[in-house]
Amino acid sequence: MLQQFIVENFLSFKNREIFSLQPSKGTLKKEHKTESIKGQWVLKSAAMFGANAGGKSNFVKAIEIGKKLVLRGTRTGDLIDFYPFRLSSENKKKDTTIIYHILCDNKKYEYGFSYNAEQISFEWLKQINKSNDCIIFQRETEKSEFDISYLLKLNPKEEESQFLSFLAKATPQRQLFLHEVMSRNIHENVSNIKDLDSVINWFVNSLKIIFPDTPYKQGVLLKAADDNELKRGFGALLRYFNTGVDGVKLIEVQFEKLGIPQDLQRAIKTDLSKSNTDEAFGTLRFDDNLYLINLIDGEIKAKKLMTVHKKIDDTDVELFSLGDESDGTKRLFDYIPLILDLIQGGKVFVVDEMERSLHPALIQQIITLFYKYSKDVSSQLIFTTHESSLMNQKVFRKDEIWLMRKSSNGISSFGRMDNLYNVRFDKMLQNSYLNGEYGATPIFETEEEISKLFSTFK
């Protein structure tokens, strides 16, 4: 789980900003907190409110950049993806800093790094304990210092120690050490790297980033057409949200007649042929529809996802293409796998513009379902929004509500409602927010200039 996230000098964040999911001392809505892990309580959700272009999406991108650099790394010869605050000449020369405080496998870790386009300047991983911190590794590139003494103690055999020392020295200056550990088959050479595995696994399997145009787990959606248990779950949620859709079904179609450009067809076939299995498959979203594609005996076979609707005048059903459904229904198809994963536990979802294409009441119900059915699991839902109706203390605790602001000189900053304002637990926040009492809303200039502009059109 994510307990804290820190970002500095990234996109519109000039200064150090701290996002904390540690709960305040309030006793309301105890079900919004996880069970204590090593004496640490963590909030299960947080909503970031703010005006357009205020920095909300940059906040999500900041969380994503660490995941990207850990999992994908930087290609040999390329510069690191570096996006400093550009409205300050000083900041363009400074490093970006990204820090995660996470709880996983009953331990608390701090993983962070500072970097620029040319190098990872600092990188460290610590286990945070009550009495003292344990440095698992740390590096400072410019001083050519790399401390892996803790890992060497855990792996005292000469060949293991030699391999770890070699790996540390061989880590390129534009690459994170954590990425090197992940990308090399280190388990064949080193026996005890549980701490590294835990943190890498958190980035790989727990942290999920979803942007407005990001489909989530399309394969699960297609699998739901054939898997009875998934089909039942999808159908129940689609009916619960009153979409008019009763389920999903796959029908065979001719891949060659889908209108896919020849170069894309060749690329798909090449990708599928790289699979080591006898029957390779993948998903394809094309022309507003979703397909399951297989490579069988060198030929691409395709199945199209259809939605099932009951006819009003008999017991038969009608099949619709996904492209025939509303934007809201299509977006809900992305969220149903998310909901199922949240309830199962072990996931940290960070969603940008969660309300996109969905009615506010539906979003509120998704959040309510999450709180109700995830009491005993360690999942988190963090999202950005400018939907004011969600700023509601019947839905959230005060310490779950965050406000994103951008100054007149383009600097974004954020803060938590309970730290910024002394509001009663029963105060209706929406009207105060819309009236600009908390900031984080659009600020308009005087109309003098546009009045002159519009007058020229008459």
Which ranges hold each PLM region?
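A short, compositionally biased
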Residues: 1, 93-97, 116-121, 298-304, ...
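Switch/communication elements of ASCE P-loop NTPase nucleotide-binding domains
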Residues: 1-71, 302, 306-446, 455-458
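An N-terminal domain-start capping segment
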Residues: 1-15, 148-167, 285-308, 443
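Glycine-centered tight beta-turn/hairpin loop motif at sheet-sheet or coil-to-beta transitions
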Residues: 12, 104-108, 130, 312
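Conserved P-loop NTP-binding catalytic core
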Residues: 37-41, 47, 51, 60-120
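Short Pro/Gly-enriched beta-strand edge/turn motifs at strand-loop
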Residues: 80-84, 286-289, 383-387
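Electropositive, glycine-dotted interaction segments
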Residues: 110-270
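Extended helical coiled-coil dimerization/tether regions that scaffold
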Residues: 216-324, 447-448, 452-453, 457
